[in-house]
Amino acid sequence: MSNLSFFQTLSGLAENAKQIAKSSSLSFEENELSHSDLLRLLNSNSDAGKLEAINFILAQMMHGENMSLYFPDVVKLVASENPEIRRLVHIYLLQYAEFNPDLALLSVNTVQKTLYDKNPLTRSTAIRVMSSIRVPAINGIVLLAIQQCITDTADRVRQSAALAITKCYSLDPSYKSQLEEHIKTLLSDNSPIVVPAALFTFEVVCPEKLEIIHPYYHRICTLFPQMNDWDKVVALKTLVRYARLTLPEPSTPSTHSDLKELLESIKSCFFSLLPSTIIAGARAFYYLAPSNQMHLIVEPLLQLLLEKPIVRTTTLRYISQIVYKTPELFKNHIKSFFLIASDSDDTCLLKINILSRLLDAQNSSQILPELLYYINSHPNPSVASTAVKALGDFASANISMAPSCLNTLLLLLKSHNSLIVTEAASSLRLLIHNDPKEIYLQYLAATYETLEVPRAKSVTLWLISEHILIIPRLVPDVLRIAVKTFADETLEVKYQILELSVRLYVLSHSEEKQNDLESRDDVVSLLFNYVLSLIHFDMSYDLRDRARFYKELASTPSSEFTRRIVLESKGNSQKEIIASRDYCIGTASLCLNEDVMGYEPIPNWADVSDLPPDSVREGIKDVLPINPHTGNIYSNNSPGVKALSSDNFKRDFGDTNAINRPKFVGQQTLEEFYASETSESSEGEYETSTSESEDEETDDTSQEEDNEKNSTPDEDTENNNTSSISTKSIMDRPLTEPEPNYWQS
């Protein structure tokens, strides 16, 4: 019964939360504000009205609406005394300051004053707003603001200053030398959110000056595991390029110690919950790690196949690129690429593509049955045809398995699925052409009349034409069947019918030096003349020109020139392969298979003679501690903070009776009650004596102040030189002041 009420309570809470979310999401839609209402609220004297208007404007911005019309009315609120209004105005300015630089200049002075605000978030937003105003006239002011903010005590402000450097540089590149010095300062930071921003700025301002990173390399590697997931993605882009250009290429027996340090730091990416971080870590490991450590990227990538479809598809594209070069990494994980019911069409195609690259003689007993099942049972024809293509590729690469695959492909020619028949015909064209056998050609000739797909007919006629000497008796019958439907065939099939007819005619009349086509009455000549007459009325001018060319050649069938032109093989022994560039994994260009703006390939490993000495990276490795409550670093000038332990932890509170003991709660004996009263009275006496001593110290202090006022300048100088303090040191007082005992009567 109690369990039932518990679940009813949970159900009620969920329903209430749903209603609250629904009402909050519809708050702006239900209270739609017109243009005149917004202007009235923005110019009203009420802070509540201004907040309502700005909140509505920001909500519309999040829905993709252009709210730049209200820029003049919003920008003047930047001087509001309400901090919430100023914060929202800063957010608005971040969006539209770049598009309205002239009006944004009105807020420069006010925004500059907020750089001294007590709230770090306000200071951070202020430097972001100032750098977003695209006016060259204030670039010097922005540079001074950056110089101030890179030494701010709050790491969030220093991070915003680092990002502001990129905007300052894009507006005026002449400040590059000064900005490089600021980047060096930020790279020496101890905060894990500042260093990634500095690396991003480095990539924008001076990516070619890798010597800037040298002294901070070990510090960056130390801070890397502490960075958040998104920052790791940004930092790895620079670190991979730095390692490829300044560190020696790893080898299996030994790897450079600095590269080992980086690889150990990158391993933290594999435990992230963010897919992009895992992919970035796998990408860095793939391009930096030695071959004996490459297996570490397999499990994290396979784990991403359990994510949502878009992540699954993207990961499969990257795995496909890895398998293309190093298939042995995934040979033990074949079942991870078997199709499941929830896979999308793109996912299915990518998985079959990966299986085709992993397929070999050793694992064919596992993969081939899966491919045959997909061919016969998958509802998507494109997936089934891709499986046929994988089967044909495997048969081409493994001669020992070719006969069994050929039998399957020949049977697939009778399929009603045009895509399956097309892929089967394309695979057969390569397999039979490289190893022509009479039994296969006889089967193709016998099944030609049942074929319905133009591609299958075209491939069949091409194979028979190329190997016409193997089955010379069957060719006239095939040609006779083909010309029956000549007028209804596609242009591709018509070309092959013409090729077959002219070859058959030249071979049949090779002993005759010259003849008249119209006077011949044998079967081959009649078929050839019939084909020429059909082409004469065809709509394709290219086909008509080719027929006239072959007719002229056929007039001298025994000449060497005619035989070389007509009978020479015109087929390509290599299968048609769609060319694709070798894009780097972890890039959008690989997903789209085309160049995307901003794509940068991974540089090759630098030559050993061009590497800098290891001494250039001998920088400071220690990282200052970070305050876990504020996120700020402890100052270098502050006294060292030692870790607490049972050996060095001492509590000096003076008299232990001064500490308030917790009151006993519960039943007490009479002796225990009087003992507690005695202890309370002693605490009261201590409190009275403490207050009296404090009063005496106050009187002494006031008397000394009166003496200082009455002293002469000479006496003041003497007092300053001695600078003696008469009051007790603060360290001599108890750490915890005793609370007054209200129970003592």
Swiss-Prot record:
Keywords: Cytoplasmic vesicle, Golgi apparatus, Membrane, Phosphoprotein, Protein transport, Transport. Adaptor protein complex 3 (AP-3) is a heterotetramer composed of 2 large adaptins (apl5 and apl6), a medium adaptin (apm3) and a small adaptin (aps3). GO terms for cellular component: AP-3 adaptor complex; clathrin-coated vesicle membrane; cytosol; Golgi apparatus; nucleus. Residues 680-718 have a biased composition (Acidic residues). Belongs to the adaptor complexes large subunit family. GO terms for biological process: Golgi to vacuole transport; intracellular protein transport. Pfam families: Adaptin_N. It is found in: Golgi apparatus; Cytoplasmic vesicle, Clathrin-coated vesicle membrane. Disulfide bonds: none annotated. The modification Phosphoserine is found at S638. It is a peripheral membrane protein. This is AP-3 complex subunit beta. Residues 674-745 are annotated as: Disordered. It comes from Schizosaccharomyces pombe (strain 972 / ATCC 24843). The keyword Membrane applies. InterPro entries: AP_beta, ARM-like, ARM-type_fold, Clathrin/coatomer_adapt-like_N. It comes from the Eukaryota. Adaptins are components of the adaptor complexes which link clathrin to receptors in coated vesicles. Clathrin-associated protein complexes are believed to interact with the cytoplasmic tails of membrane proteins, leading to their selection and concentration. Beta adaptin is a subunit of the plasma membrane adaptor.
